[in-house]
Amino acid sequence: MVDTEMPFWSNLNFGMNSMDMSALEDHCQPYDIKPFTTVDFSSINSHYDDILDEKTFLCRNDQSPIDYKYDLKLQECQSSIKLEPPSPPYFSDKPQCSKAFEDTPNSFIAIECRVCGDKASGFHYGVHACEGCKGFFRRTIRLKLIYERCDLNCRIHKKSRNKCQFCRFQKCLAVGMSHNAIRFGRMPQAEKEKLLAEISSDIDQLNPESADQRVLAKHLYDSYVKSFPLTKAKAPGHPDGQSHRQNSRGYTRHELADDGGGSDQGAVREPRAEQGGGDSNLPALSVALRGGVREITEFAKNIPGFVSLDLNDQVTLLKYGVHEIIFTMLASLMNKDGVLVAEGQGFMTREFLKSLRKPFSDFMEPKFEFAIRFNSLELDDSDLAIFVAVIILSGDRPGLLNVKPIEDIQDSLLQALELQLKLNHPDSAQLFAKLLQKMTDLRQVVTEHVQLLQLIKKTEADMCLHPLLQEIYKDLY
């Protein structure tokens, strides 16, 4: 939980935004957590190759709003999660849709070398070329080699490319290789988009399922940015030391563009780190968490097939998934030094949070550790939208009544996620496996969160949580 002496939390928007596992860079401790019954690691294929040669889900617009009833078994209170219109984007008035949704075919299919037709290793000397043709062209140019003339116009392909060097070099020039266009490694974005646009229709004809998965990914992205007022793209950058001012307690406030002539309107209250007593602010945190639950519920009902599930299963999925989603999205507002608060207008340093009295000093540290590892994956909102949907549709949650339809939906989401990551991050071959590992890490973070919350509940006499949150925490891990 949070320190009862920290008013800033009232401003924190919680509604923001097997393969070779030894390749995972995160050295996480093993946890005794039940395995995912719907995650099939065997579907992940290795993306490493030997060095070559010389070296539809449709959006249900007719869905009616649903109130998800939580039976709190309380005599005087029965809470419900009611869907409310999402708040408009706070930090941006322009949608920032990922490039993955602009002419985006199944880009993980190998791009051919423009010279010999072998698999291209990258964008070299102005064209997509394999390692062999790249090295051949480089040596020819650097050493100023002159080959014996050939008038046969030899056909250059993978098996014959070493037979006639003259025709091979002429083919390099014909396809546009030039020393003036030298570029190694990743292809430029403009060239990538042009190439994807050229082969998009062909890929969809060869693999109609990929088109359905792209439609699903686009639908989830649109629902994501609509449901959550503060996404990763909308969040402001972390303080750079110039656009903010910092007090002696480790709290930073961004300068406001218009403060009403120097007034304190819109100012963010600063936290207090004194060791003594203070008024509890947990009710304010409860309000923020309830807002996050509403936003997550709004997004969940836009996942194709979710509203057709048993109502009790919908509630169970939301109950177990809400905090995993909150901590996933909170990572977008965190770095190794601190966390953005007050809808991005303030910054709370990590050192300040660690200086609080126990047990509150231990509250945020696991979230920082997770956020640092999670942010290293460099996901964008189009990736996160599908990942959040996968978290919600986890078929191994305790108490589910009808698991099969949940697993079917998650299987489709996992296929869409794998395609999305291969498309949006073609240079990160292990990304899908790493992201699945983060689902396990999230469960451990939530488990520790609940355990610490129970400790605070015993030590803080004035702790009070909204009945909805009490029901969520009840029997949670």
UniProtKB/Swiss-Prot annotation:
UniProt entry tagged with the keyword Transit peptide: no
Location of the motif 9aaTAD: 467-475
CDD domains, sorted: NR_DBD_Ppar (cd06965), NR_LBD_PPAR (cd06932)
Zinc finger (NR C4-type): 113-133, 150-172
Location of Phosphoserine modifications: 87
Tissue-level expression: Expressed mainly in adipose tissue and kidney.
Domain of life: Eukaryota
Biological processes annotated in GO: cell differentiation; cellular response to insulin stimulus; fatty acid metabolic process; hormone-mediated signaling pathway; intracellular receptor signaling pathway; negative regulation of cholesterol storage; negative regulation of inflammatory response; negative regulation of transcription by RNA polymerase II
Pfam families for the chain: Hormone_recep, PPARgamma_N, zf-C4
Sorted UniProt keywords: Activator, Biological rhythms, Cytoplasm, DNA-binding, Metal-binding, Nucleus, Phosphoprotein, Receptor, Transcription, Transcription regulation, Zinc, Zinc-finger
Gene3D superfamilies: Erythroid Transcription Factor GATA-1, subunit A, Retinoid X Receptor
Cellular localisation: Nucleus; Cytoplasm
Start-end of DNA-binding region: 110-184
Domain NR LBD, residue spans: 252-475
SMART domains (UniProt xref): HOLI, ZnF_C4
InterPro entries assigned to the protein according to its UniProt record, in alphabetical order: 1Cnucl_rcpt, NHR-like_dom_sf, Nucl_hrmn_rcpt_lig-bd, Nuclear_hormone_rcpt_NR1, Nuclear_hrmn_rcpt, PPAR-gamma, PPARgamma_N, Znf_hrmn_rcpt
GO molecular function, a single term: nuclear receptor activity
Region of interest (Disordered), residue spans: 231-281
Keyword Repeat: no
GO cellular component, one term: nucleus
Function summary: Receptor that binds peroxisome proliferators such as hypolipidemic drugs and fatty acids. Once activated by a ligand, the receptor binds to a promoter element in the gene for acyl-CoA oxidase and activates its transcription. It therefore controls the peroxisomal beta-oxidation pathway of fatty acids. Key regulator of adipocyte differentiation and glucose homeostasis. May play a role in the regulation of circadian rhythm.
Protein family membership: Belongs to the nuclear hormone receptor family. NR1 subfamily.
Summary of subunit composition and partner proteins: Heterodimer with the retinoid X receptor.
Domain notes: The 9aaTAD motif is a transactivation domain present in a large number of yeast and animal transcription factors.
Name listed for the protein in its UniProt record: Peroxisome proliferator-activated receptor gamma
